A protein has these predicted regions:
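Intrinsically disordered, low-structural-confidence terminal and linker regions
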Residues: 1-68
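A long amphipathic alpha-helix within ATP-dependent nucleotide-binding catalytic cores
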Residues: 376-401, 426-485, 524-548
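A short beta-strand motif that forms the metal-chelation/ATP-contact edge
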Residues: 405, 482-495
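Histidine-anchored nucleotide/phosphate-binding helix
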Residues: 100-119, 124-125
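Glycine-rich phosphate/pyrophosphate-binding beta-alpha loops
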Residues: 421-426, 491-504
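Peripheral (often C-terminal) accessory segments that flank ATP-dependent C-N-forming ligase machineries
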Residues: 8-15, 512-591
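Conserved N-proximal alpha/beta basic substrate-recognition cap immediately N-terminal to
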Residues: 109-113, 125-321
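Conserved ATP-binding module of the ATP-grasp superfamily
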Residues: 267-271, 299-343, 360-395
Length: 591
């Protein structure tokens, strides 16, 4: 089981500590919430107590009673953003602490920045100080639980407690649903804890169906990850590939083995790559049977990758299989595609963590070490050809041409977003469209191909519960048998709420604020940028330094989690100017 799922809960004290397998005890620092979680067996008990249903029955009920829907601006809804289980944000936090590195406080970040997406009159649910600052002056529900990493777990604990307590805290949300059964609840992702919570909330409110701005669970869980773009290494190995066959013919043949093609007949542009499947159960990757999250009785964290052997024979067999598949994937990339370097990444990672670039595919020692490390997480991985992205520089930044295209309220969003990247980590976006993509070095043919591929993808899932999300693309070379050919390829499916949502929301706001300019026919572009605010840089202070408006530009501080994470934005008529101004603003703030 995943680390977040295997945690036990105890009453909170003043601080938490994490006991690492090597004997070190480190403080759970840099977070405004604790590391507590709900174990799977207890989640099942809570599900039965709240709903009278087992987990499988609750999943079936959610398909009937929770309806994916886009939120309308003229109808106040409810906003409750919790870290999605599939993104493994808790696991990423543990890895950072184990390595002695600062960790991003994703629960607080998601709560605080969700306010940027709120419509007029939306009821906001959260618990942290940055969220309260962002939500000032808006209707709110403040959750009195800072122990649990996931807001959804904190809310389930509340719901499973005394009725007089949950009715007092959640009364405004229940009253809103009763007053307007068509009210839309907006969540980051409709994962299992959130499904159970919303089914319970629906029953308490007495409404027939609950509208939820999130993808249907099958969309996010079955199709919202990298593995759907690539064949499994073992399946690809069985594909005849005669020597001398043209590389693009090989790539096309392998594309027919991908889940998207096998189920829907959709061939998407992709880089050479293969999935490496974890054959064991997720629990086989965890040496310790449980993780304690009691303050003063330190949290037990799974073994640092590669430090200790796995704890049972089944796990050892799964690890051996994983390592063999990784070697096979490397051999296929070298033999069929002539590629010498690879990129190893978890198929469900969503924050740019745990990605290894420039992997030498002919080095067995490196492959073995990476296999041991990756296998510890008990999840599937992807070994893809290393992408040498085309690049374009503006003042203050060199962009990798790795644009993303998005779905909003079930429809293909305008344009595309070019990403600010720090290594493999997302740090903001610039909005590009037909009139501005060339200024960032994106050829018209590449822009058109990306938009066409995304339109096909959205059309495929029309009516299946696709409400929001984004797809990351690469405009890159991989070398080998492809020589200097530039490939345009889908690389990642983020079928849930995502960072570019804030770019699109700010762009809509900017078009209203700069309405006189837009009325002249002048286009408006925008850029968002992640910053690292000082420990005393709360949102009111950041706004005093950032917010300004002129007839041709608009800047605003969107989020601040002091000492951890912030988001600023700039809008103006020119995309390059928007990017350069947001970078200059970041530089002034951090000088």
């Amino acid at each position: 089981m995943s680390t977040v799922e295997s945690r036990e809960v105890r009453p909170a004290r003043e601080r938490w500590e994490v006991a690492l397998p090597d004997g070190r005890v480190v403080p759970w620092t840099g977070f405004q919430v604790g590391p507590a979680g709900i174990a799977p067996h207890e989640l099942a008990h809570i599900c039965r107590r709240l709903l009278g249903l087992g987990p499988a029955e609750a999943e079936a009920a959610a398909r009937e009673e929770l309806s994916p829907a886009g939120a309308a601006r003229d109808r106040p809804g409810i906003v409750a953003y919790s870290p999605p289980m599939a993104k493994r944000m808790f696991e990423g936090a543990l890895e950072s602490l184990a390595a002695g590195e600062p960790a991003e406080d994703w629960p607080t970040i998601l709560e605080a920045r969700s306010v940027c997406l709120a419509h007029e009159g939306d009821l906001l649910i959260g618990r942290t100080a940055p969220w309260k600052e962002a939500a000032a002056g808006r209707p709110v529900v403040e959750v009195p639980d800072h122990d649990h990493f996931h807001l959804s777990h904190a809310l389930l604990r509340l719901a499973d407690g005394p009725a007089d307590r949950w009715s007092r805290v959640l009364g405004p949300a229940i009253d809103r649903l009763r007053a307007d059964p068509a009210c839309v609840v907006r969540v980051y992702a409709l994962d299992e804890p959130m499904r159970i919570l919303l089914l319970w909330l629906k029953r308490v409110a007495g409404v027939d169906r609950l509208l939820v701005e999130a993808n249907a669970p099958e969309i996010t869980e079955k199709w919202g990850h990298k593995a759907v773009l690539h064949p499994a290494a073992r399946a690809a190995h069985d594909l005849p590939a005669p020597p001398g066959r043209a590389p693009f013919d090989v790539l096309d043949a392998e594309t027919e083995l991908t889940p998207l093609y096998r189920v829907f007949g959709l061939a998407v542009p992709r880089l050479p790559g293969y999935t490496v499947v974890w054959d064991g159960e997720p629990a086989d990757a965890v040496t310790d049977g449980g993780i304690r999250t009691t303050p003063g009785d330190p949290v037990r964290v799974p073994v640092t990758p590669g430090d200790e052997p796995l704890g049972n024979g089944r796990a050892r067999r799964a690890e051996d299989s994983f390592a063999a598949q990784l070697v096979l994937a490397a051999q296929l990339l070298r033999g069929r595609h002539g590629v010498r370097l690879g990129c190893l990444k978890p198929v469900r990672g969503g924050t740019g963590q745990r990605i290894h670039v420039g992997v030498p595919l002919d080095d067995p020692d490196v492959l073995a070490a990476l296999a041991r490390q990756a296998a510890r997480s008990g999840e599937d991985y992807l070994l893809e050809a290393h992408a040498d992205y085309l690049r374009h520089a503006v003042t203050g930044h060199e962009f990798l041409l790795a644009p993303s295209v998005h779905v909003r309220a079930g429809a293909l969003a305008d344009g595309m977003a070019l990403q600010f990247l720090n290594g493999t980590m997302w740090e903001g976006n610039v909005f590009l469209d037909e009139s501005t993509h060339a200024a960032f070095g994106i050829a018209r043919s590449h822009y058109a191909r990306i938009r066409h591929a995304m339109a096909d993808f959205v059309r495929l899932f029309e009516g299946r519960g696709l409400i929001n999300g984004g797809v990351d693309f690469a405009i890159a070379r991989v070398g080998g048998r492809y020589d200097d050919t530039t490939l345009v390829a889908m690389q990642d499916l983020n079928l849930s709420a995502c960072g570019a949502d804030y770019l699109h929301a700010f762009l809509e706001e900017s078009r209203t604020v700069l309405g006189a300019l837009a009325g002249t026919g002048t286009g408006i572009s925008a850029a968002t940028k992640v910053i690292r605010p000082a420990s005393d840089m709360d949102l009111p202070r950041l706004r005093r330094l950032v917010d300004h408006r002129t007839p041709t530009s608009y800047a605003r501080a969107l989020t601040s989690v002091p000492g951890n994470w912030g988001l600023i934005a700039v809008a103006c008529p020119d995309a390059v100017r928007a990017a350069e101004e947001v970078l200059a603003l970041e530089a002034r703030l951090t000088a």
